[in-house]
């Protein structure tokens, strides 16, 4: 039995699978089964993507053709017109983007626009889709759909043997993964999805969910996509589809315990909160290294930073590992104010980055931070700079911090904690400007946090 996949290679990006990752659903279609027409315009689509990213989505799955039961096929030109502007905008901001398509022309256009992943509901049965995946070296999701479903054909054997059906799905996914590998797709780029609701009944979907552990141990990243599906409504008694989000979170948590490392959902916030609590209570949240920047220029600066360091150490599932020296620095971005005290603290934490950011804001608030003048005087700043295995590009949840590379008051203290700060930044995709072009230059060493 293979070990659970630890990462998913998606072109130029690698998604760490130390915790369960959330794929937010972004349908730019007028006829999706639960949110059709809600995100038709580019502005509406991007606003919803931003909300999902800040709620905890690790990647966004953009779809331009509904494949709900009884769907109407969409021409490739129309599908491209729907998805490409959204993908271009998200990818330009550093968002990890998947495109939900079964058409090679759309796949190429989406990848050229910056998508990192092809999510094919037809399981890469089209040889041209396989060629596209191999040519671009992107991440792929090979999904199972019942034979004839995408052509609108009814099944003759539905419901006869649910356990046998689950075994068939597992065998199909393994076969399609091998097809992709033989075409030159990197095995670590292949994710498998059993496809609940694609021609299946509730008993079959439940049997497939019960077999999650066995399927995850095939060694490929496993995507669980139960969001608002009919089987979720059938067992929870929740209807219509939009009323199934809490029930979806229950399925997601069961799948995560069984080894699913990517979940595809509409309601990111509910599932993210449920997964955070599941991982904390089950003791399966991984400990991660993180760097936190501390700063301030009001009152007793050194005492304020020491108190913030103690508050970090008191956070749940978190401990301070090391701290830089405290530096006195010139103001950055806004002059004519007192000099700052700045430091960087290394922590080990099992908190999700969104939960950590909320905790950091709480430390600022407890210190009396008032946010009036941007970049103006403040008693305390507590910023998440970097977190191991985490990359986020939401308006509120952004990691690594986008301004690390231009801030002398961050890079110098960070250099106290890493062997080579410029090499560290290069590994993490952080561009550093030349020392003379940085802001907030160091004036002197002020003291220590110990």
Pin down the residues of each PLM region.
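Active-site-adjacent loop and "lid" segments of alpha/beta metabolic enzymes
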Residues: 2-3, 10, 17, 34-43, ...
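Extreme N-terminal starter segment of soluble prokaryotic enzymes
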Residues: 3-7, 21, 287-291
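Catalytic domains of carbohydrate-active enzymes, especially glycoside hydrolases
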Residues: 47-63, 258-259
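Short acidic capping loops at alpha-helix termini that bridge into adjacent secondary structure
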Residues: 186-189
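N-terminal beta1-alpha1 ligand-phosphate binding loop
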Residues: 285-318, 324-330
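Flexible, gly/pro- and Lys/Arg-enriched active-site loops
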Residues: 332-340, 351-450
